[in-house]
């Protein structure tokens, strides 16, 4: 009986710790705020998609993460988008 209560308390402790780590990570990245702004009103139905999209590029290096690795891409500075090869 003692073994079962110990396992239960350990499981609760681990779940609390991991949930706190997840909430801190969301605060650091700002993901919670982006979703909160997008879901605040029905007038902003398409806002969640645009807020969570990748940031516009500023250099060609930024396009390496958005384009396939082998082909790569080039940053279109005028539009702030990546043109993949």
Swiss-Prot record:
Protein name: Putative defensin-like protein 258
Upper lineage: Eukaryota, Viridiplantae, Streptophyta, Embryophyta, Tracheophyta
Leader peptide range in chain numbering: 1-25
GO cellular component, one term: extracellular region
Keyword Disulfide bond: yes
Compartments, as annotated in UniProt: Secreted
UniProt key word Signal: yes
Family membership noted in the UniProt record: Belongs to the DEFL family.
Disulfide bonding pattern of the chain: 57-75, 63-82, 67-84
Keywords: Antimicrobial, Disulfide bond, Fungicide, Plant defense, Secreted, Signal
Gene Ontology terms: biological process: defense response to fungus; killing of cells of another organism
Source organism of this protein record: Arabidopsis thaliana (Mouse-ear cress)
